[in-house]
Amino acid sequence: KTMKNEHLENLVVGEEHWTKKGDVDLFMWNKFLPSDEVKNGTILFVHGSSMASQPTFDLEVKGRPFSSAMNYFAALGYDTWCVDMEGYGRSSKHRDITCDIANGADDLAAATAYIKQYSGCTGIHLYGISSGALRAAVFTEQYPERLGRLALDAFVWTGEGSPTLIERRKKLPEFSKSKRRPINYAFVQSIFNRDHPDCVEPKVIDAFAQAICSLDDSMPNGTYIDMCSRLPVVDPEKITVPTIILRGQYDGIASVTDLLKFFEKTNESSIIKTKILDALGGKKYWWSKLRSFVYEEKHVFHHCRSGGAVLGGWFFNRSSYPTVG
């Protein structure tokens, strides 16, 4: 199905930014429509354990419009940002550390401070996927005043019922012996066969793998070590901003049981709503569905039966937004 504002993707502008965290240089990427139209807000996207930010959130796939989450939300009037965590992509890799979840939360502190100073925005919306969701949640506990809304995709709390983490823990001694682990094209392909095959178009996997491997041939071990041995790292009672949790049917890291227990411990004044979305027609449909998230609800759980971890997030100002079919 053709999106009604597909023509806007070609108008989206990208700009490179850099900020400091001590002696660490953090690469940031900003995409937006260069117009005077009303902006719906600012979104910062947070990547996971095995890929930098641009391959994750600004992917280009020939003949496939809006493969970039940043382009999609920029076309909707959002000011979109992503940041390479320390040890990933274009950001500094010189320190002899594992770049764990807590370190990633520090990266987000530096990134959000820069965005607020640069653009003057208030209430940055934050989207994190997998270990990026953990980084985002830890940061939210520390700096709730900087945020508008929070989206946690492929999130895990205690790790209960996670077949992926059960298998990954078998390699914990290996991960603990080194600061980084090698990755290559075949490794990236294996990510899409881990939970359930055939959930993603082959040309998307190819473009994704090539983009990741063009920036990195190894990844930090810190988030793997944390997810295998140090969960939980987030206290749900300290998440006080409006939050949506996204989970794909075949997500091998985040079990429904684990996530619902997390929800049970959220703020008592929160409105909790569970939706089961069946047979979703791919990422564009999923992103547009997220726009219908009721503005007043504080915490919402979505379970998607059509795929693994879903790329995208949604933060909605109901007063004004372009139409997407």
Model region roles, listed by residue range:
Residues 54-55, 81-99:
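Glycine-rich "HGGG/HGxG" loop immediately N-terminal to the catalytic nucleophile
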